[in-house]
Amino acid sequence: MFGSGNVLPVKIQPPLLRPLAYRVLSRKYGLSIKSDGLSALAEFVGTNIGANWRQGPATIKFLEQFAAVWKQQERGLFIDQSGVKEVIQEMKEREKVEWSHEHPIQHEENILGRTDDDENNSDDEMPIAADSSLQNVSLSSPMRQPTERDEYKQPFKPESSKALDWRDYFKVINASQQQRFSYNPHKMQFIFVPNKKQNGLGGIAGFLPDIEDKVQMFLTRYYLTNDRVMRNENFQNSDMFNPLSSMVSLQNELSNTNRQQQSSSMSITPIKNLLGRDAQNFLLLGLLNKNFKGNWSLEDPSGSVEIDISQTIPTQGHYYVPGCMVLVEGIYYSVGNKFHVTSMTLPPGERREITLETIGNLDLLGIHGISNNNFIARLDKDLKIRLHLLEKELTDHKFVILGANLFLDDLKIMTALSKILQKLNDDPPTLLIWQGSFTSVPVFASMSSRNISSSTQFKNNFDALATLLSRFDNLTENTTMIFIPGPNDLWGSMVSLGASGTLPQDPIPSAFTKKINKVCKNVVWSSNPTRIAYLSQEIVIFRDDLSGRFKRHRLEFPFNESEDVYTENDNMMSKDTDIVPIDELVKEPDQLPQKVQETRKLVKTILDQGHLSPFLDSLRPISWDLDHTLTLCPIPSTMVLCDTTSAQFDLTYNGCKVINPGSFIHNRRARYMEYVPSSKKTIQEEIYI
């Protein structure tokens, strides 16, 4: 095994370790040990702690550390063999990461660095940290008995006074670079999924998604939404809550009794459990879709059922489109196998802090550490606090977000850009975000050689922008510039011809941006969407005309339409009599402008859905293996949603700041927004052209 003489490896029978494991793992941490899990623990303890595993405290300390990691990862109650191996491997990886930062040149041995597979690879042994929570082992002397002072010695922690550099925690992450995690609904935890290219898959297999990705895409969305609903405060202590309760309220109104109302609780019922339960009231959660008959249906992992929305009363303030997750209440009739919906709403949202705490503070973006098969990086709470304090101190940092549709082939837009860049050059921002489309005409393959091709014109447009930027040295030297592609930009426009293409959209190819790369010191060609990690904040940038798509595909409810007809008839009758009630002439104090209502509806729908594109594939195609880059779980700290079909807005929902700069040119004015991350405030700016 190993050449060190401090540990004498022994073979421990699992029943001998059971009393000690039961005392630590079961009684103290409430875990249950399976026989194969106990065998794996006995094998590790015998190999790495040796013959003195009963006398010294090393075994107890290892079991306590093992249980802490197991509970932190939320692996459940039962300790099995595969879980033991994964947790032990992660404990090794954690000590490697900690050791590489704190003691990079020491080469002693830690008991977590010893495995059976290392017998012929002694050069790969992990060094032991002098501050490890497990006792150090001498290479030349037998295992010493620790003193009382050593037993209660706390692990070494870096000094909190060590200065942090904000540049180390500022990173732009494209869709292809974002780490992928799959969701296990049974264990209710995220599992790291390695990149195909890292697995050595070459050729087409490394680029095309698997059919399994297609299957898991909507299943993952459903399970994440279902778990979020069950974490809602109204579902706490039990899953018996009905957020709609329209039928019960109607019954109470008809009875007109003052006695104590009965509970209107209902459980979320799987669709398959509707069979045989005729004329009963249910609460369902599922995906809104159309079946093969062309009628509306609701789907969940257990099945699907046709729904009747002729008498549905939807909750106001949401968009209902095919592909979104909805909560519906109604009555199921076995005749026709149809579910008659009485009420419909979207699942409730959840704040970012609650979601992060639930998933164990996973570092999904890989800023504080890169995850792999054996190690899952997590956000350090103390570091998050220090980053937040540093963020508050950097009051001079600001992000400038230009409006969308920066047509570089339009002379009017180039003139406006010149004025804005001149103003920004005096006080350069930390970040300058450019959002496409960067050409007014979609770039496509030209069938004629008489005129200049559209791709050549596309490159010339960026060369002209590089010439313009070269006049502002202060800006190009001190500002990081991010370019987000639009629907008219390459390569997606070659297929979509300016229509909405597949998400996520790849960055603009480097063949068209060489001159800008030479002029600008810090430039990032990002995907759409893209994410920015800035200290303690996560910022999502998404360029899409979502408001227009929601309005085109929203579900129309016949009951609401009939009410609108009655209202119009009443208005016509009141006009004929020339008598207008005074309350119709006075605006209600809580009545909001139409634009504000539309923007709130847009933001609430996206964040409550937990997805940037809650549509069916037929309405908005998505790369199956990159659907995780569109997921908003947890919701970001700030989201830049650039939508030219919606009004310019700035609002906060569930702690998430949502900004829409709108179109760049509007009524002979060039518009942009300044975002100050230290205070999370925005300033709307405009320049007349």
Swiss-Prot record:
Amino acid composition bias (Acidic residues), ranges on this chain: 116-126
GO CC aspect terms: cytoplasm; epsilon DNA polymerase complex; nuclear replication fork; nucleus
Post-translational modifications: Phosphorylated in a cell cycle dependent manner during late G1 phase. Phosphorylation may facilitate the interaction with POL2 or the activity of DNA polymerase II. Phosphorylation is independent of DNA replication but dependent upon CDC28 in vivo. Both Ser-141 and Ser-613 are phosphorylated in vivo, but in vitro only Ser-141 is phosphorylated by CDC28.
Function, as annotated: As accessory component of the DNA polymerase epsilon complex participates in chromosomal DNA replication. It is required during synthesis of the leading and lagging DNA strands at the replication fork and binds at/or near replication origins and moves along DNA with the replication fork. It has 3'-5' proofreading exonuclease activity that correct errors arising during DNA replication. It is also involved in DNA synthesis during DNA repair.
Polar residues composition bias: residue spans: 132-144
Misc note: Present with 3110 +/- 251 molecules/cell in log phase SD medium. In eukaryotes there are five DNA polymerases: alpha, beta, gamma, delta, and epsilon which are responsible for different reactions of DNA synthesis.
Compositional bias (Basic and acidic residues): 98-115, 146-155
Family recorded in the similarity comment: Belongs to the DNA polymerase epsilon subunit B family.
Biological-process GO terms, alphabetical: DNA-templated DNA replication; DNA-templated DNA replication maintenance of fidelity; error-prone translesion synthesis
Highest taxon above the source species: Eukaryota
Annotated segments matching region Disordered: 98-155
Full protein name: DNA polymerase epsilon subunit B
Subunit organization: DNA polymerase epsilon is a heterotetramer consisting of POL2, DPB2, DPB3 and DPB4.
Residues with the Phosphoserine modification: S122, S141, S613
Alphabetic keyword roster: Cell cycle, Cytoplasm, DNA replication, DNA-binding, Nucleus, Phosphoprotein
Pfam family name, one: DNA_pol_E_B
GO terms of molecular function: DNA binding
Subcellular location as annotated: Cytoplasm; Nucleus
Primary site of residence: cytoplasm
